[in-house]
Amino acid sequence: MAKWTINDSSKIYNIDNWGAELFSINKKGNVCVHPSPNSKYSIDLKVLVDDLIKRKIKPPILLRFMNILEGRIASISRVFKNAISDNNYPAKYQTFYPIKVNQQRQVVEAIANFGKKYNIGLEVGSKPELVAAISMSTGNNLPILCNGYKDTEFIETVLFATRVGYDITIVVEKLFELEKIVEVSKRTGIVPKLGIRVKLSSKGIGKWSTSGGDDAKFGLRISELIAAIDMLKQNDMLDSVKLLHFHVGSQITKIDKIKNALIEGTRIYAEMRKLGVNLEFLDIGGGLGVDYDGSKSSYFSSVNYSLEEYANDVIYQVKNICDDAGVPCPNIISESGRATVAHYSVLVTDVLNNNTQTLMPDFESILTEPEKLSPTVKKLVDIYKSIDKHSLREDYHDTIQLIQESVSLFNLGYLNMAERANAEWICSKIIRKINSIVEKMKPIPDELQNFQLSLRQTYFANFSLFQSIPDSWAIDQLFPIVPIQRLDEKPDVLTSIADITCDSDGEITSFVGENGRTKALPLHKIKVDEQYYIGFFLIGAYQEILGDMHNLFGDTNAVHITFNKKTNYKIDTVISGDATWESLKYVQYDSQEILKRVRNNLEKDVSLQKVSIEESSHFLELLDKTLQSYTYLGE
């Protein structure tokens, strides 16, 4: 058999396809991160994590690679610049980052700084996001788009921000909202910069397709759009409308759905121009997807188009329709948040242990002393001894039937616990023996295709699924998961990944594999005293802000890293994860009050001589230490 290589590992984890040339495996068998596609520079993730642990930064650790963030902004801007040139498009392109995708200050701040040379803007959908965007725009002069529902206070804030020099466009989502805007504008004497969101009949595809179509939550129907134009005319505010916006969903997997939306949206733009609305911008919303599984398909965790194809189709379709309608081409805006930030962050954590059975030495006597066994276990031993490739299916089915029979006999009191343990042990031996034969069969019979799942072990990892990758639990989103080390060795254990929450939903059983979605993740047998790390990739979009505090596991440690040619990497920022007291404070517990209550109770017990002073003092020290410690597991 040929020696396992890093190329074999790259294939089974499909790294070359989902990695966007930002992730690879080096000669040591460790995962590497690159600042940009095809860059000769890289950071060894295993070395980086070891260095962070030496700095007392414990896993789980969220690694944010700021160069990747800058590179994604540059890539999106570049492909649109090329598409504009190739199609002789007479207007400009501008990207806006929807901060709902990842509102962390350091992330938005980095995007604001990186985006200056690309004229990037910020999109917001709430009052807190508006305030955050205004703070980031201060000194940077970033344009801001306001989507979502708005009350009078929101509208007043936008209008006065406009008065004092901020470039803010307020997008009308509903007719009643426009009425409020008109009222506030007249009352304050401030003319707003307006956009209108239209509700397309065209829909996206996948889990977010309901963002488009006739039943979409946001936007004006065509009849309402005409009514809005009439209202603006009556109030001498039609010239305030500079932007038309539509959005048909996030993570659009098929390019034809994007084309359909572009055609319908641009036709509406053209008709509005003919009605005398001097629109300057066409905001095509989000939808630019990420190929999470590397299949380049229309599956919901992938996309069947490239970044270049997306940009070319946007520019071509808009220009073609505008030329046909005889109207000026608009400046184009997109809100591609997911595609901007998904790749830049990686969660790395340690595997704690697995659920492999510990085999006691005396179990081996089952095979040599069958006369002492119950009839059910004796039948299982006979199956084990007689298995061959000609009887695999029958032996497998008989084994399952007999193990179920052993449970029934145990429940009825005819089988004791030791005999049931014997049945479980010999069953596991049979399954492994069958698997050793199945692995050598080509092709594998249909009935045995999923057989290996019965061998899947659960590896317990030091993280909270609900905190760090909630979409995996909530909507069955696929994220690439790869061991960051030993990739020059064959991973010979099929696994599922369980977190450390007390919830059976905290387990991942669908993974990115060589041929798309797979039900088991190949990992290595963990060596004695080995720190074995796995990485969760492409988690930069939505996961941090959607994460919740199930079991009060809080934010993880986060580290901002940039590439450095001299020292390989530079740590820019370390953000400590939540301590126990911080998680408790989130649910209204005060750490000092906790200590006070416990201390008072202990003093009573000391006075009654139930505990000693030393025991009381030691427990208080432990409790205080726990309050100050990381919510995740240590040694």
Curated annotation (Swiss-Prot):
Its cofactor is Mg(2+); pyridoxal 5'-phosphate. Pathway: Amine and polyamine biosynthesis; agmatine biosynthesis; agmatine from L-arginine: step 1/1. Coiled coil: none annotated. The keyword Metal-binding applies. One of its GO terms (biological process) is arginine catabolic process. It catalyses: L-arginine + H(+) = agmatine + CO2. The modification N6-(pyridoxal phosphate)lysine is found at residue 100. Keywords: Decarboxylase, Lyase, Magnesium, Metal-binding, Polyamine biosynthesis, Pyridoxal phosphate, Spermidine biosynthesis. It is an enzyme of class 4 (lyase). GO terms for molecular function: arginine decarboxylase activity; metal ion binding. Its EC number is 4.1.1.19. Pfam families: Arg_decarb_HB (PF17810), Arg_decarbox_C (PF17944), Orn_Arg_deC_N (PF02784). Substrate binds at residues 282-292. InterPro entries: Ala_racemase/Decarboxylase_C, Arg_decarb_HB, Arg_decarbox_C, Arg_decrbxlase, De-COase2_CS, De-COase2_N, De-COase2_pyr-phos_BS, Orn/DAP/Arg_de-COase. It comes from the Bacteria. Belongs to the Orn/Lys/Arg decarboxylase class-II family. SpeA subfamily. Catalyzes the biosynthesis of agmatine from arginine. PANTHER family: ARGININE DECARBOXYLASE, BIOSYNTHETIC ARGININE DECARBOXYLASE. This is Biosynthetic arginine decarboxylase. The gene is speA.
